[in-house]
Each structure stands twice: as structure tokens, then as C-alpha cells.
A protein has these predicted regions:
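DE-rich acidic low-complexity regions and acidic surface loops
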Residues: 1-228
């Protein structure tokens, strides 16, 4: 027997609520990013721009986006300030039509919603009442590697930062050794690409030894610098 959710394709709809990017029927997409201050939603025309009339394509993609945004707000239970970056539309009538489409799409939402007009920068601000923690808040945790930033420093940048910290520790009184416990890729970079810089620190500080310790259980950007 086919599960009921699978039969009506509900599983795929639930899964879409966990994705940063949601595809639109025309080939465009919406990208949803939540921050401490607000939720930003960007409309991307992508493949939809292959149509002949760019203005009409932008208008139709924005209409699709308005429907999908209203749906995603309910699915994810997003609240607070929401800023939508619609694809630029020149005719004012198109802007008003998209605003009205969004207002119509959110009418069935039980949360209280306020919607502004599209600004001359193509941005629409709206607010949605917080009824409960959002889907992201209740089912996600902060990434232990990047601490929620979404990016980590590259090996070169991180290695240079560690070198500066090693020298700071080496300058302190009564320091005999400085141990840098680092991820394997960082250790490889320091010992191969920056060996001369490590040796220079030892030379400048006289009796201080710098020991690079690779740790295969550690990932960038994490490291530890200890003086002995």
C-alpha cells in the first residue's frame, strides 16, 4: 500500500519547507534567508528569463512567487518582519497586480499580516504575527562548525591568523614552547607553505619552540594555541 502522504505528494511539500531555495513552476525560484532582524526573500528568474518578453516573464515569475511565498510563510510559520525582493517591473500596474496577488494569497492565513507597497527599489515589506516558533527554530540547531555564519575561513587566512597568535604567545615571558593544535589541512599548510614563517618566529624569540600538532578530529575553523 502507498502511504497517504506519498500518494498526495505531501512528503515533497513538507521537505520543501526545509530547503533554502524553492523552485517555481516557470523555472524561477525563491530563496529564503532568516536573520536575527528579519526574513529576506529573493526572487530569482533563472531559467524563466529564456522567454522572449523579459518584462512579461518578470511579471509572471513574481505572480508565481507571491503565491509560493504565502504558502511558505504558513509552512515554515515565519513571523516578524519579512522583506521580499521582487524582480524589477517597470509598469506600475504590474507592481500593483503582484501586491494584490500576495494579499489575496495570504487571506487564508490565520496569522495577522500587514503588507506595504513595492518600493522603487523593488522591495516589499510585510509583517506576520508570530504564533509559535518557526519551523527552523524548532527543528534546526546552529552548525557547530561555522557557528551559524554559513561560511568558514579558507586555509590560508586561518593559517595566517594562527601564526599571528603563535607569535603573540611566544612574546610572553617565560614561554618555552608554543603548541598549535590544528586541523590536518592547516597543519599541512603551516608545515609546507609557511615553514619559513614558523622558523622566523622561533629565531626572533630565541629559546621558544613552536610545535604544530595535527588533529584529525578537528575541523576548520577550530584550533587551539597553548604556551608551555
Amino acid at each position: 500500500e502507498i502511504p497517504l502522504f506519498s500518494h498526495y505528494q505531501i512528503e515533497s511539500q513538507i521537505e520543501s519547507a526545509f530547503q533554502r531555495e524553492v523552485r517555481l513552476p516557470s523555472g524561477g525560484s525563491i530563496v529564503i534567508d532568516s536573520t536575527e532582524a528579519l526574513t529576506a526573500i529573493d526572487i530569482n528568474s533563472a531559467r524563466a528569463t529564456r522567454g522572449g518578453d523579459i518584462e512579461e516573464t518578470a511579471f509572471n515569475t513574481n505572480l508565481e512567487a507571491a503565491d509560493e511565498i504565502a504558502r511558505q510563510l504558513r509552512l515554515r510559520d515565519l513571523g516578524g518582519l519579512i522583506v521580499i525582493d521582487f524582480i524589477d517591473m517597470t509598469p506600475v500596474r504590474h507592481q500593483r497586480a503582484v501586491e494584490n496577488r500576495l494579499r489575496e494569497a495570504v487571506r487564508q492565513d490565520r496569522a495577522r499580516i500587514q503588507i506595504s507597497h513595492i518600493s522603487r527599489f523593488g522591495l516589499l515589506e510585510m509583517s506576520r504575527q508570530r504564533l509559535s516558533p518557526s519551523l527552523g527554530e524548532s527543528s534546526h540547531h546552529v552548525c557547530p562548525r561555522c557557528s551559524g555564519t554559513g561560511t568558514v575561513r579558507d586555509n590560508e587566512s586561518l593559517s595566517l591568523s594562527i601564526l599571528r597568535l603563535i607569535e603573540e604567545e611566544a612574546l610572553k615571558e617565560n614561554t618555552k614552547e608554543v603548541h598549535a593544535i590544528v586541523p590536518v589541512p592547516i597543519a599541512s599548510y603551516l608545515l609546507n607553505e609557511k615553514r619559513a614563517a614558523v622558523s622566523a618566529i622561533e629565531s626572533r624569540q630565541g629559546d621558544v619552540r613552536v610545535i604544530i600538532v595535527p588533529n584529525d578530529e578537528m575541523q576548520t575553523p577550530h584550533y587551539s594555541v597553548l604556551r608551555v
